[in-house]
């Protein structure tokens, strides 16, 4: 009887699209349909500075073909995020000589009035505003489809995004301006003359490295992660545009599309630097981080209340 009920539940879930926090197949239940999501080598994780192991043999990543490129780059709203397809001529060579070919680039963000930060990886428990993933597959495999099921098949270059009072990041202008063209899930457009390297942090020399998984179903545990220590800087206007432009398959705004951090389970996180080269972890810096988040949360709460008041006024006069 129990087995029958389990099969009925799994069968019902198979008819649903996976989500992060709502519905039958939310994050807590991914593992029922995608067993790897319940594995012991899952991503993302919290990068705890005191537990990161310094490895002086880790050299800087070598990125080839990431600069300004002529041509067309398909960009799609897949119902979970915005995804940019990349040519395999973009390559990343790691410290051990492994070469990975680029497949796609996508983003994770917050946006909900009660939680604005949306990075997947956190640093000492602190969540950044956005996280960028450039997904690659090992060059020894003929395609991404072949590599995605191999134990050493994938690598992801991740970058965290900060927002304060920065001016507009012009390297993102082309990307941001085309979000309105893919508002609905399933819609696609084309970006032209894209420079991926300029969309990444200015200093790519320093990074954290560990073995993990894809952060969305099927959560396969075959990903070598490289999380860059430096950050991308975007303006508040650019952040808000990304957070509020796209709709999912239920025509709801795509927000908080990030997975919770997963247990490290005795894995080792390495870095090719002794101390964080771009941020001092002092009491003052942490206080500034939290005060900045409180300020932004209050602004989102104000806007949320204004929207509710406006909606109630409309319902009162136009029943």
UniProtKB/Swiss-Prot annotation:
InterPro entries, per database record: CA_dom, CA_dom_sf, Carbonic_anhydrase_a-class, Carbonic_anhydrase_a-class_CS
Binding site for Zn(2+): 106, 108, 133
Localisation per UniProt entry: Secreted
Domain Alpha-carbonic anhydrase: 16-273
Main location: secreted
Cofactor requirements of the protein: Zn(2+)
E.C. code: 4.2.1.1
GO cellular component, one term: extracellular space
Functional summary from the UniProt entry: Reversible hydration of carbon dioxide. Its role in saliva is unknown.
Designated name of the protein: Carbonic anhydrase 6
Native organism: Bos taurus (Bovine)
Gene that this polypeptide is encoded by: CA6
